Amino acid sequence: MNKEEFIHYCKEINIEINDKMYDDLLNYYELLVKWNSKFNMTSILEQNQVFLLHFYDSLCLSKYINLNRECTLCDFGTGAGFPGMVIALLFKNVKVTLVESSQKKCQFLKHIKEIFDLENVTIICSRIEEYGINNREKFDIVTCRAVTSIPIIIELATSTVKVGGLLAPLKSNCLDELNNKSLYKEFNLKLIDVYKYNLPIQNSKRTIPVFKKIAITDKKYPRNYSTIVKKYKK
């Protein structure tokens, strides 16, 4: 995805990319490549691929969830900042909390925050299920990208979503993971929509299931990670 394609396809999802925005993303890309040689954060390093598979893919959330407002967003398992840091860079009105367990990746995220002077970004070096114990019902939107299966995501992160807020993970094709209505009831979630689309150029399938939280999460959740995985892994 070259510059012209990136600007064009962002416009199709109602994001107007100006020169500064593009230059900031280009700088982000260059820093990613530089730090990746030390910390191995991504296997995708070619510029056009990063703009498509990391930057554009991250921004697709804004097509389906209103980010043009004052709101709080948590991105867990963010890695090198996808989708949360990209959203924070282009949507300064969104207060973004990035939760990442890797100290090395958190170092990179802190560097990006400093380089771009992102006052709307908070970086937490923790596992989401540990962070969620003392940060309950906190965020308007909670998201992640390609972290794990939907049932595991639900238990890991639902406690951090405000009542009335949204859990909206970015996934590839996950329709076979969306049939557990008893699980939604257990976590006081309502599946309000499933957005399906294809990434441009590659035409690879993407899915964003959107859950609305209708009541507080039972305090026994989330459990520790090994217990969660044992219950939901096939």
Placement of each model-derived feature along the sequence:
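Short "lid" loop at the C-terminus of a central beta-strand within the Rossmann-like core
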Residues: 129, 149, 172-176, 199
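Class I SAM-dependent transferase core
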Residues: 2-68, 74, 104-121, 224
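Conserved SAM/SAH cofactor-binding pocket of Class I
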Residues: 48, 59-148, 154
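Short loop/edge segments at beta-strand edges and connector loops
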Residues: 19, 45, 125-127, 193-195
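Helix-to-beta-strand junctions that scaffold the AdoMet/dcAdoMet cofactor pocket
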Residues: 91, 161-163
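Conserved beta-strand signature within the Rossmann-like core of class I S-adenosyl-L-methionine
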Residues: 164-174
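SAM/dcSAM-binding transferase cores
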Residues: 181-234
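Residue-level signal for inorganic ion chemistry
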Residues: 32, 87, 171, 211
